[in-house]
A protein has these predicted regions:
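Short, basic/aromatic recognition patches
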Residues: 1-22
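Gly/Ser-rich catalytic serine loop of serine hydrolases
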Residues: 18-25, 106-108
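Short beta-strand scaffold segments in enzyme catalytic cores
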Residues: 23-37, 125
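Zn2+-dependent cytidine deaminase-like catalytic core
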Residues: 36-159
């Protein structure tokens, strides 16, 4: 099993712990080793000093890494966040059948991408629309498209 598959499987397992409808799981790795894991949480929470309506899995993991690095390096923690890769996947079930578990798109949203960049993270692995893992530098993610989709979601009316 290649590294990408191994990491996506671990993040997929973390997603199972989520109680949200869209289950996202994430891990942080360094030098091929899993450092921590997390999943999305629907509770209003403070992530990286910003209050959010929910905590996205990648931000839960980033918060854990930052907390660990701040303890060790203090204010200089941002000099070390680029050594970690965050992996995030979205797990979904069709027909509520455990056999039909699949990975779906989990590309980080506009806000998560911006926050991760601001904190000095460099790379992220995420499941694409085909359920395959993509590894990309955060600075190469087209946030204009992500922002557009977030704005569309905010203006949609749900009846």
């Amino acid at each position: 099993m290649c590294r990408k598959d191994r990491f996506s499987n671990i993040a997929f397992s973390a997603a199972h712990k989520s109680v949200q409808r869209y289950k996202h799981g994430a891990i942080a790795t360094k030098n091929g080793k899993v450092i921590c894991e997390g999943h999305n949480d629907g509770m209003r929470t403070k992530v990286l000093n910003n209050y959010r309506s929910c905590a996205h899995a990648e931000m839960v993991v980033a918060e854990k890494i930052i907390k660990m690095l701040k303890k060790k390096y203090g204010k200089n923690y941002k000099n070390y966040t680029n050594k970690y890769t965050i992996w995030v996947v979205r797990k979904s079930m069709h027909n509520s059948n455990e056999k039909n578990l699949k990975m779906y798109e989990s590309k980080p949203c506009y806000y998560c991408t911006k926050d991760l960049l601001k904190e000095g993270f460099d790379k992220i692995g995420y499941s694409n629309e085909d359920g395959e893992m993509v590894v990309q530098r955060l600075k190469d993610i087209d946030t204009s498209q992500l922002h557009k989709s977030v704005l569309q979601l905010q203006t949609e009316k749900f009846y």
